[in-house]
Amino acid sequence: MIIIGFPGIGKSSVTRAYEGDTNTTGYIDLESSNFVKDGNWVKEYCGLAIDLDLQGYNVFVSSHKNVREYLAEKQDIFPDIVEVFPSKELCGMWLNRLESRYMKCKTDKNERAFNYMRNNFDTAVDEMEHDAIIHKVRITKENMNDLKKAMADYWDERRFE
């Protein structure tokens, strides 16, 4: 499964079975900031995500618009591409979460995520809500701290449709 993850959903947390261990959960957080942002990065980044998916991993990818657009075109071949993003009602809580993450770990990536969402939260949620990705998991107050359960609940509901 390829999981397009909104900043702060818990991608890194899910990939760690316990502190310091990132390789035993079946989940991989494919960090986009490790890729050189040249004209080919989206194809290379998404290609790696697809390759890892084919190997049986659940792969978290960034929610950049060009990543979502690229993966949307692959849904006929890879039907288990899913987006995970918060509901708009969580804006204040979400910004607190991102700020707290930045205060604990002052990386450029965390600072950029916090600053971008502080100014663009509603727009970012709207874009994901209305893009071409079919499967969408919405984070609510009830499932905000259990990403795996939110995704499992989504797929369980789809089985009965």
Predicted features by range, described:
Residues N23-I81:
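Conserved nucleotide-sensing/catalytic segment adjacent to the nucleotide-binding pocket
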Residues E73, L95-S100, T123, N143:
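Inter-domain helical "communication" segments and dimerization helices
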Residues D76-L98:
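Conserved phosphate-donor/acceptor-positioning beta-strand/loop module used by diverse small-molecule
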Residues K104-E161:
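Small-molecule kinase domains that catalyze NTP-dependent phosphoryl transfer to phosphate-bearing small molecules
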